[in-house]
Every structure is written in C-alpha cells, then in structure tokens.
C-alpha cells in the first residue's frame, strides 16, 4: 500500500536536507535515515525506515525545489501505514511547524 504526503513549505533550504541532518531527533520519533542520494539515482531523495518493532515499511522523500514542496511516499507491504505515517507527520509538525504552509495526506 502507498500513501502520499505533500508538504508545501515557505521558500528556503531544502526540507529533505534538513531531515537528513537531523538523525538524532528522528530517532525520538521512531524513524531512522537509511539512505540518501546515490550518484546512480535522481538527486534530492532520501529514505526513512521505522525503528519500532513490528512496524514495517519505508518512507521515500523527495524535495521539489521549484514548488518548495516535500513529497513523501509511505510504502508498506502488509503492515498498516498509519503508525509510520503518524510518526513522520508528528516529526514534521514538531520540527518544521513554521515552514509548513499545507500538509495533505492522500491514501
């Protein structure tokens, strides 16, 4: 199952870069940065995984500079996407509340 989260932000530094440099705080929300841009893949993406037991899935994060928007795809196979989505939204609203203008979740 895939869930897409669109986060429209104020102009400024890439939110994906800020998330990538915030590993200590990510762990407080049960998330860990597992990958960041590889030379063989499109630039501007990161991948998060949950550290909570029994909570699978991954979050693929892409920063759209022109739209100043963060696009997050939550991908799970059999697990409920709710817990990992909630962890991400909680983290974003706690850390970047002033930068976020709109947050939309599309199941």
Q: Model-found features: residue ranges?
A:
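Terminal, regulation- and interaction-focused segments at domain boundaries
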Residues: 1-28
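Short amphipathic alpha-helix segments
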Residues: 17-27, 41-53
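A common structural junction motif
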Residues: 23-30, 92-96
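Short, exposed beta-strand/loop patches in secreted or surface proteins that constitute
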Residues: 34-41, 61-64
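Short proline/glycine- and acidic-rich turn/helix-capping motifs at secondary-structure junctions
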Residues: 37-43, 104-107
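A short, structured beta-strand/loop element
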Residues: 45-68
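Secondary-structure transition/turn motif
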Residues: 50-54, 73-80
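A conserved amphipathic terminal alpha-helix motif
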Residues: 81-107
